[in-house]
Amino acid sequence: MKHSVSVTCCALLVSSISLSYAAEVPSGTVLAEKQELVRHIKDEPASLDPAKAVGLPEIQVIRDLFEGLVNQNEKGEIVPGVATQWKSNDNRIWTFTLRDNAKWADGTPVTAQDFVYSWQRLVDPKTLSPFAWFAALAGINNAQAIIDGKATPDQLGVTAVDAHTLKIQLDKPLPWFVNLTANFAFFPVQKANVESGKEWTKPGNLIGNGAYVLKERVVNEKLVVVPNTHYWDNAKTVLQKVTFLPINQESAATKRYLAGDIDITESFPKNMYQKLLKDIPGQVYTPPQLGTYYYAFNTQKGPTADQRVRLALSMTIDRRLMTEKVLGTGEKPAWHFTPDVTAGFTPEPSPFEQMSQEELNAQAKTLLSAAGYGPQKPLKLTLLYNTSENHQKIAIAVASMWKKNLGVDVKLQNQEWKTYIDSRNTGNFDVIRASWVGDYNEPSTFLTLLTSTHSGNISRFNNPAYDKVLAQASTENTVKARNADYNAAEKILMEQAPIAPIYQYTNGRLIKPWLKGYPINNPEDVAYSRTMYIVKH
């Protein structure tokens, strides 16, 4: 699985100077003359600032424009990025050595101070980063205090020992800390670039340190990137132009793919799965992904503030029917929030999983009646989702289940991505579609999302027992002990139902047969354009 770094009680040293993850073209391969790729993304990126990114549309582009201390290979294992080696004697104080040929797109060196500035900016309340919590999750000293306004950004536990040595101090030992540094939130930004003005992320202005630079952007139409000639491994970059097309309708993206306008789609309509398998064999992929599709309930206001209502709604979602009939592309029912493919997680059987849907429906009716709802007083609520045919399809199916089994009147509401994010962040919903794809391959990436102080806690769930068991998990020294804590946390989620996990993701997409180097088996779907190339066809 993803945790490739071995941990011992004494000295820990990882040295990978000679390794890199780039396009590896086999000897004898005949490349196409035109190395231009068109990638589909599901929506217009909300921001190209790593500290302001929140969703996959922008993250996919940001991974081409910036590079962190480490990268992931095709299996999700950690490989060098800007850092060539890292070490720790106690899993608490980490030292990273940066490569001396890492440069920004303007040719200036990438230094340890760039990382200090960027990470301090991430946690600075003035930045309003939706991912500031990630620094606290990683346990960087004083991160949470800075986020809470109780300390200043310069007190963050990160220091530039010299231009090429970065020292990070954690508030507790964390064996998988290096894995976390692959996250986009920890990508460096150039101080002079950020401070040049509000339009620093526009084409011609943005100065990244990734394999590509932003050449063109037409909002809601396309983003075009071309090789960064100053990138340290640019000699191995094969693709000379990558165009990202934001299309939130899977059918439209699939139509463009079949017409030859797109080389990779981020998804495809579920109802086309069998037809696509027949029409374009070898181009349809559905490997498991480190992600869960779920509905979040507003636990602070409205009818879903009542735990009985939330639990009844969760129980009447027929997850077996959803995965087998509504979706039907290899997804698994989500009886818990943490996906089965997560490293270090062995789930205990859920009571829901051991009951028939008829039994679940019967118990749900009793719960809803106890909450004061029934034929004379039907439950009314709004189900919000971001615009997408697949999301709509699932919402219609769930609304039908709730109406048929509980008599619930459901109003379906769809919003474009940016509006949906605003509604989600302000708590303007009863029930909202959500998903989480792990930021790293360990159960805490999912379960900490529901802790009371987490900015990603969409449902506003506040449960001291839940917070306590996850805090305990972070101090455990063995996988077995952590697994017990994680299962205890999952039990609380099942009983309190701040969310209703629906299914575990598969990474459904279409890929042209002449495109090579796509890391289809990366569990987190981390795909850098610089590893890909097009063969003659």
Swiss-Prot record:
Q: Name one GO molecular function term.
A: oligopeptide binding
Q: What is its main location?
A: periplasm
Please provide, in alphabetical order, the Gene Ontology terms of the cellular component aspect for this entry.
ATP-binding cassette (ABC) transporter complex, substrate-binding subunit-containing; membrane; outer membrane-bounded periplasmic space; periplasmic space
Q: Which residues form the signal peptide?
A: 1-22
According to its UniProt record, where is this protein located?
Periplasm
Q: List UniProt keywords, sorted A-Z.
A: Peptide transport, Periplasm, Protein transport, Signal, Transport
The effect of R424A is: Cannot bind murein tripeptide
Q: Name one GO biological process term.
A: tripeptide import across plasma membrane
What is annotated about its quaternary structure and interactions?
The complex is composed of two ATP-binding proteins (OppD and OppF), two transmembrane proteins (OppB and OppC) and a solute-binding protein (MppA).
What task does this protein carry out? Part of the ABC transporter complex MppA-OppBCDF involved in the uptake of the cell wall murein tripeptide L-alanyl-gamma-D-glutamyl-meso-diaminopimelate. Is involved in the recycling of cell wall peptides. Binds the cell wall peptide L-Ala-D-Gly-gamma-meso-diaminopimelic acid. Can also transport ordinary alpha-linked tripeptides such as Pro-Phe-Lys, but with much lower efficiency than OppA. Cannot bind typical tripeptides such as Lys-Glu-Lys, Lys-Lys-Lys or Ala-Ala-Ala.
Listed name of the protein: Periplasmic murein peptide-binding protein MppA
Source organism per entry reads Escherichia coli (strain K12)
